[in-house]
Amino acid sequence: MVHLTSEEKNCITTIWSKVQVDQTGGEALGRMLVVYPWTTRFFGSFGDLSSPGAVMSNSKVQAHGAKVLTSFGEAVKHLDNLKGTYAKLSELHCDKLHVDPENFKMLGNIIVICLAEHFGKDFTPECQVAWQKLVAGVAHALAHKYH
């Protein structure tokens, strides 16, 4: 369980209300595939992922990134029940997709990087603390079925 102060929750919801899910989601997933190229093995049906440019401009990467970040929005809505929120996705990623749970941590950290880039000075160190707690909590909730 993630313990967030009321200030941290406020920071998370304030930033989230300004996030452009399509843009940021596509960027985050694309960055993960570029920075950690072994993760492309889960996306064989996405077509050309042979270079950073191909990954970042791939419409399937953009669409799936938006889907992932939309799902992440559920965490923002249910900050006090992340395990329950992600129970079905945890089962899917564990039992059917066989995704290494470390990937959840990597993607979470990349989401934080993207938010920092997009929001600049509004993404204060205190705000980053809140978001790091949240992405760690989401990663833990998604990995729950693996334990």
UniProtKB/Swiss-Prot annotation:
Top-level lineage group: Eukaryota
Positions where N6-acetyllysine occurs in the chain: K60, K83, K145
UniProt keyword list: Acetylation, Heme, Iron, Metal-binding, Oxygen transport, Phosphoprotein, S-nitrosylation, Transport
GO terms assigned for molecular function: haptoglobin binding; heme binding; metal ion binding; organic acid binding; oxygen binding; oxygen carrier activity; peroxidase activity
Species in which this protein is naturally found: Didelphis virginiana (North American opossum)
Claim: Metal-binding is one of the keywords in the record: yes
Positions carrying Phosphoserine: S45
GO cellular component: blood microparticle; haptoglobin-hemoglobin complex; hemoglobin complex
Modified residues (N-acetylvaline): V2
Amino acids binding heme b: H64, H93
Record domain Globin: where: 3-147
UniProt xrefs under SUPFAM superfamilies: Globin-like
GO BP annotations listed: hydrogen peroxide catabolic process
Tissue/organ expression: Red blood cells.
Record function comment: Involved in oxygen transport from the lung to the various peripheral tissues.
Similarity annotation: Belongs to the globin family.
Protein name: Hemoglobin subunit beta-M
Modified residues (Phosphothreonine): T13
Residues with PTM S-nitrosocysteine: C94
Subunit details: Heterotetramer of two alpha chains and two beta chains.
Keyword Transport attached: yes
